[in-house]
Amino acid sequence: MKRFTTATTDIKKRRILRVVPVLAAAGILSVVLTGCGSSDEEVQRYSWPLATASPEDTVTQIFAEKFAEEASDLSNGKMKIQVYANSTLGGDRDLLETCSDGDIPFVVQNTAPQVSFMSDLAVFDLPCVFDSLDDCRKKIDEPDFYSLISDVYTNGGYHLLGMADQGFRVMSTNKAVNSFADFKGQKIRTMENSYHLAFWKALGANPTPMSFSEVYIGLQQHTIDAQENPYEVIVSNNLYEQQDYVVETNHLPHLISLIVNDEFFKDLPEDEQEIMTEAAQLATEYAREQSDARIADKIATIKESGTEIITLSDETRKEIREASKGVYESIREVIDPAIYNSYMDGIEE
């Protein structure tokens, strides 16, 4: 492990001093630096914050914790990363802003809230692109596509270290969906995302943006008929208790990015950058494995409750894709053509 140069050490000290008020205000200050500005014989040790807006028992948190663990192991304990969950350091938007400023170097979060900051990430809002998670992961890992997406993050002030997932987003509802016509009129809660709203409108549904904290009561009081989320969210928040069906629309992958402030990353010695990259690769593989196992477990929980899981026919999926062409065109108009073409390469349009 290389020792920091004086310039690099000064940068790190300044950054840690900047983040101290943020952590202190939250009552969780744990950043530690020893050996700063001391003799060459002393060892540099440091603890950097990594923040998520997700609860602890989620793939997002598993991804974050595994990255921190691997970074520590690969550096023989010299690189310490402290993970803070449950929006302790802020919500999704807050975390993106503080990461961009360099106050919190690491963030793990879903790509959806990042579209407001980096419009090219709307490529991940293209509906019903993949037939399987394996196909989706192969595309994400494809060198040419990954390079293009990495550039998007770099231009936004971040460095993309890895991208895992929480499976596909699926629909839960109190009205069975066995054909395309069955989507018509369903009051479904969505995120406040124009492309998501347009997708459900194209299916004939009645999408309603709603705070996630209101979804359970909305289903209970029949303000809404349905909602859409990954299996993990549906089970961990007990949404299936208020629903008769889960429909495997698999309309979007729920992608989880691991990002670091770009300037912060570039200031690291080369060997530490390599450790970060390797740790992220290992964490990505682990998070995907955990996601698959947890999805199977969540499906079992839903079935045991009596809620029926409906798998759509190829014909219905084809109708959904056909109805979504307007969404494709809307997204295609606002993102880099190279990104769109790379993402859709090998996909029948």
Regions found by a protein language model. Give the residues of each.
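Transmembrane alpha-helix boundary/anchor motif
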Residues: 31, 144-148, 195
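A gly/proline- and charged-residue-enriched helix-loop-helix capping module
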Residues: 134-150
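Short, low-complexity disordered leader/linker segments with a strong preference
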Residues: 1-47, 349
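N-terminal secretory/targeting leader peptides
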Residues: 2, 37-136, 153-155, 159-349
